[in-house]
């Protein structure tokens, strides 16, 4: 089955797995998915990233994080912003702050995929892929 929006598929898989309190989830491997996963790990939303398989069957296994005795998901919400039908680009001054800085906007820039904080520090804008909080 072809997937027309692999980023939305990735976000949905993570959202569903965290709601069911799974410890890991697998997503089809791509450079963009791996870049987004690395940003999520750097920002503390996921615990680990492992790649399995080769070629078109390769998968990325993400370790999900939970907090507290009742295992509340670290990722409360993930929202896709820029979609294949409507791309959203922002310059440095217009980059959004998610929940007043508590959340993260993941930005695809000319220097790679990074969080909104890193993009502001480097003074570059780009395509706003998603919000995570």
Swiss-Prot record:
Gene Ontology CC annotations of this record: ribonucleoprotein complex; ribosome
Example of a GO biological process term: translation
Gene name of the record: rpsH
UniProt GO molecular function: rRNA binding; structural constituent of ribosome
Quaternary context: Part of the 30S ribosomal subunit. Contacts proteins S5 and S12.
Protein name stated in the entry: Small ribosomal subunit protein uS8
Gene3D superfamilies in UniProt: 3.30.1370.30, 3.30.1490.10
Superkingdom in the source lineage: Bacteria
Role this protein plays: One of the primary rRNA binding proteins, it binds directly to 16S rRNA central domain where it helps coordinate assembly of the platform of the 30S subunit.
Keywords: Ribonucleoprotein, Ribosomal protein, RNA-binding, rRNA-binding
Keyword Ribonucleoprotein: yes
Keyword rRNA-binding included in the entry's annotation: yes
One Pfam family matching this protein: Ribosomal_S8
Family: Belongs to the universal ribosomal protein uS8 family.
